[in-house]
Swiss-Prot record:
Family matches, as NCBIfam families: DnaA
Protein name according to UniProt: Chromosomal replication initiator protein DnaA
Organism: Stenotrophomonas maltophilia (strain R551-3)
Entries under PROSITE patterns matching the protein: DNAA
Family matches, as SMART domains: AAA, Bac_DnaA_C
Region (Domain I, interacts with DnaA modulators): 1-67
Keyword Phosphoprotein tagged: no
Quaternary context: Oligomerizes as a right-handed, spiral filament on DNA at oriC.
Length: 443
């Protein structure tokens, strides 16, 4: 039994079984030589573990392993793959080496177009990824860049495209990497003086998929090598699919020539899902798990959890885990009881003061400007946007929103909401502002 298993056994004896099942059992452990990395499915579990259990985990680890360094991360533990099938090595950020990555084995075949839930927020991204999979290398979508906040489905679409390419052509060399893996592989090649081999290995793929290219910012040599890799693949009509947490031109430290290359193909924003899409996602994920979730429970989660798909999944995991443990049916009352802290945290994260500050900062204003009685266009439009965002992202009533904006009447708030919705249909810049603000508030 390893140090983490022994620590977990002790924690099970010290804490209520229900708490252990909800907060500690979902953790995936990666025990290193002198540290432990715990992967959690969502940020809420990370916060709970950090606040309630981390100090005790460190004490137990020091006792059983002789060290107490513990790192909490969101995601899944890296899965080992067979080194003999690999074209090159890609060490992770935490260890000096990692099993090599094969062309086929590093695509997660769970993520397909069939189980991707389509909505207004991701419709264009889905269509673009599907076209890239159908016609890889076509200049209309090469490179394909999917950008947006965390947990919105960018990686799902990337995997779906890669899996579709391999389904159509089982011999296709489709390589998926996180950006830090590209960086680590390059560093190793530099150290071992095997850069020529490094370049050949990347340039022989049929499709290159790289996640989170914002990680390249400020890394000049990495950007240079990726720039040359990009050019070789593009000239060879090999498909490139990338993701970024924002539009690349907004990433400081990314070279102008690389930003220019990324604009050659198709860039698509993936936005936070709307209510209907969120509800559909909850129901779809529940079906995948074989769980029976009433529609009203899905609607409750969708109404309260507005930020991203990952948080929706986290809420669903917490709900189903407690239901399985207690044997209770999943009802609205059970969901409200189980998710009370999670829902409260969501409400606190997106508050009226937070919205006002975010909008004011975005437009280069002071909060007092948004609350003032002045009606100049430079103030009136941001004020309307702030009120509309508050209606969209919080549970506050129109009168409450009006009160928060210097005592304005509820009809003023209603007019602002309708006005912004109407204007966004025709004003692309306003729509872009709205989407960017949604992303900022959902991070």
């Amino acid at each position: 039994m390893d140090a983490w298993s022994r620590s977990l056994e002790r924690l099970e004896a010290e804490f209520p079984p229900e708490d252990v099942h909800t907060w500690l059992k979902p953790l995936q452990a990666d025990l290193r030589v002198d540290s432990l990395v715990l992967y959690a499915p969502n940020a809420f579990i990370v916060d709970q573990v950090r606040e309630l259990y981390l100090a005790r985990i460190r004490e137990l680890l020091a006792h059983f392993a002789g060290f107490s360094d513990v790192f909490l991360e969101i995601g899944s533990r890296p899965r080992p793959v067979e080194a003999q099938n690999a074209p090159f090595s890609t060490p992770s950020a935490h260890v000096s080496s990692e099993p090599q990555v094969p062309f086929a084995g590093n695509l997660d075949n769970h993520y397909t177009f069939a189980n991707f839930v389509e909505g207004r927020s991701n419709q264009l991204g889905l269509a673009a990824a599907f076209q890239a999979a159908q016609k890889p290398g076509d200049r209309a979508h090469n490179p394909l860049l999917l950008y947006g906040g965390t947990g919105l489905g960018k990686t799902h679409l990337m995997f779906a495209a890669g899996n579709a390419m391999r389904q159509a052509n089982p011999g296709a060399k489709v390589l998926y990497l996180r950006s830090e893996q590209f960086f680590s592989a390059m560093i190793r090649a530099l150290q071992e003086k095997t850069m020529d081999q490094f370049k050949r290995q990347f340039q022989q793929v049929d499709a290159l998929l790289i996640d989170d290219i914002q990680f390249f910012a400020g890394k000049d040599r990495t950007q240079e090598e990726f720039f040359h890799t990009f050019n070789a693949l593009f000239d060879g009509k090999q498909q490139i699919i990338l993701t970024c947490d924002r539009y690349p031109r907004e990433v400081e430290g990314l070279e102008a020539r690389l930003k220019s290359r990324l604009a050659w193909g198709l860039s698509v924003a993936i936005e936070p899902p709307d209510f209907e899409t969120r509800a559909a996602i909850v129901l779809a994920k529940a079906r995948e798990r074989g769980a029976e979730i009433p529609d009203d429970v899905a609607f409750l989660i969708a109404k309260k959890m507005r930020s991203n798909v990952r948080d929706l999944e986290g809420a669903l995991n917490t709900l189903t885990a407690r239901a399985n443990f207690t044997g209770r049916a999943i009802t609205t009352e059970f969901a409200q009881e189980t998710l009370r802290d999670l829902l409260r945290a969501q409400q606190q994260a997106i508050s009226i003061p937070n919205i006002q500050k975010t909008v004011a900062d975005y437009y280069g204003l002071q909060i007092k400007d948004l609350l003032s009685k002045r009606r100049t266009r430079s103030l009136a439009r941001p004020r309307q946007v702030a009120m509309a965002l508050t209606k969209e992202l919080t549970e506050h009533s129109l009168p409450e929103i009006g009160d928060a904006f210097a005592g304005r009447d509820h009809t003023t708030v209603l007019h602002a909401c309708r006005q912004i919705r109407t204007l966004m249909e025709a004003d692309g810049k306003l729509r872009e502002d709205w989407d960017k603000l949604i992303r900022k508030l959902s991070e």
